[in-house]
């Protein structure tokens, strides 16, 4: 005799009576879990309501993007002191002490300036809670930043680290992809579209964000003299950047791309956006040496060593950058200048181990998720650092090196549970396999 089934939700029994029909379906996975047709109808209705509300939210978000986005007040509740900002950078960026100081002070002054502007605005609105009697109503200029340093020296990382710490949106763009309006490529305004996307389409938040433009040296003119030919991605782009860097109202299409006369636009005021431009500036050291040397003819000048190039880059002046190919107007809008040194072998070893997000710590955590201990021998770490220096990719190239020799071991990682994987120098050079040691038996596995 079959047992009577009960619905796990309404607790009512199954009934085959045509007048009080209630058919119950039992789960194939768990026979103790049952549901009746009435409860299924109720759940279907609730899910339909949820889908409709979710669809409404998506439509509302799309409408914001298509029209004028939205504006919601965005203020920094607390502006950390320069020492505190540098301490944050110390956790992630190895070396570059002078650059970290310059960067921390510039970011602090920028957001202190924004805070002062907000207080002045509230004072003008006769807000009794704001007291600025000890301060004069002086207009404070924006302190945009120009970073000079080789690839992988930490330029982008510094900007990303402080933006994350301050919970400020940041947009990172490559200057080499930018072209003048009317030519194939990206318009300069697309940089602001990325910033708006990073701000979740909050215009107020975007207007207090950070824009990082890398490879700024790649859009330089070939000489100080103006070219008679069209300059699609050189001086023309610098002139277009000048408008947004100095602070102006810019109309940008909500979806990026090219502007259309009949399209909708989002208006962004760039006056309070912090612009950070960076580049390697290959060949700048020779320009500086030519200016500083007393040898007029220059025939006996010897080629500079790496250390000499780094030392002379710290002597850079505005005219050197003009000679390199940046227009004076753009340089004038980037008053804070800092030079980063290339990374030494010792610093590269520290980068692998010391930062909070150090690569070795990351890979050890990945292996630990499969209950495998990953050990790097000291000679192996030095060899990884040496390979990165030889490839001239800076710290950016470290991950590719580790991925290369760890690929096979990570492929078989799930079946190595409870083991220890030891990386040797020969393993890094791909002359030997990693040592896999079973903890329980303390011997090398085949």
Curated annotation (Swiss-Prot):
InterPro entries: AAA+_ATPase, ATP-dep_Clp_protease_ClpX, ATPase_AAA_core, Clp_ATPase_C, Clp_protease_ATP-bd_su_ClpX, ClpX_bact, P-loop_NTPase, Znf_CppX_C4. The keyword Iron does not apply. Keywords: ATP-binding, Chaperone, Metal-binding, Nucleotide-binding, Zinc. PROSITE patterns: CLPX_ZB (PS51902). GO terms for cellular component: HslUV protease complex. GO terms for biological process: cell division; proteolysis involved in protein catabolic process. Zn(2+) binds at residues 7, 10, 36, 39. One of its GO terms (molecular function) is protein dimerization activity. The keyword 4Fe-4S does not apply. It holds the Pfam family ClpB_D2-small. ATP binds at residues 150-157. Residues 1-55 form the ClpX-type ZB domain. Belongs to the ClpX chaperone family. Component of the ClpX-ClpP complex. Forms a hexameric ring that, in the presence of ATP, binds to fourteen ClpP subunits assembled into a disk-like structure with a central cavity, resembling the structure of eukaryotic proteasomes. ATP-dependent specificity component of the Clp protease. It directs the protease to specific substrates. Can perform chaperone functions in the absence of ClpP. This is ATP-dependent Clp protease ATP-binding subunit ClpX. It comes from Helicobacter pylori (strain ATCC 700392 / 26695) (Campylobacter pylori).
